[in-house]
Amino acid sequence: PDFVIPRVGSATTYYQKAVFRHLERMGVLFINGSDAIDNVKDKLYTMQILSQNNVPHPKTMLVKNPIDSDYVQRNIGFPIVVKSLSGTHGKGVYLAENKRNFEQLVEMMEQFNERFNIILQEFVKDSHGKDLRIIVVGGKVIGAMKRESTDGDFRANVTRGGGAKPVELDEQMEYLALESTKLLGLDIGGVDLLYDNDGYKICEVNSSPGFNGMEKYTEIRVAEQIVTYVKNKLN
């Protein structure tokens, strides 16, 4: 092939990654490359890269079972967001409202795997059920929208039934979207921002963002922008 646009994101398997790397070494153009996919497949590694470069994000902690809930309370506090190491569309993401709720969630996880690892993240209260999704293609922001839950869920994903509307970018939003995708090596990226009185924080970055919602609510032709970018890269 002349080019490949991987659309598997965090679900990328070892076999798929091996094929990608083989084709890359044959000179095939990849949008995004295998290293960039690795950078965002692991949510903790994404946060480590952003933290190293002083990019604002919610306070984040990796823990393994058994978990000291008192330590969690002292260092992050409750409510707290509980995440699997990988995943998209809001899957594997839970909100523990208090210490007891968190301990019950841990007990449930123990039924499936007693030696699990999870990511714990600061809950940004002002952004409950709301976030900003920004699409970056080739180092340029091509669209942004505000997503909002319609059923009281703390997650705002359109794929989970949430609504959305276009939003005008400000300087900080644009900087965070461009800086994060640049640091992670992404040609195409979906950047999710949370916000409060202190400003914006990067919640997650996706290497294979869905764009049906962006096209529906903003009328921006994301697929067309991607095709134009690929054509320019090939030429």
Predicted features along the sequence, with ranges:
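Short glycine-rich anion-binding loops that position phosphate/pyrophosphate groups of nucleotides
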Residues: 9-11, 86-87, 208
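Structural detector of well-ordered beta-strand residues that form the stable sheet scaffold
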Residues: 30-31, 58, 81, 119-121, ...
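ATP-grasp fold ATP-binding core
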Residues: 50-51, 73-91, 114-127
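Rossmann-like NAD(P)H-binding beta-loop-alpha module
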Residues: 56-77
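C-terminal active-site "lid" helix and adjoining low-complexity regulatory extension at the edge
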Residues: 168, 172, 182, 195-235
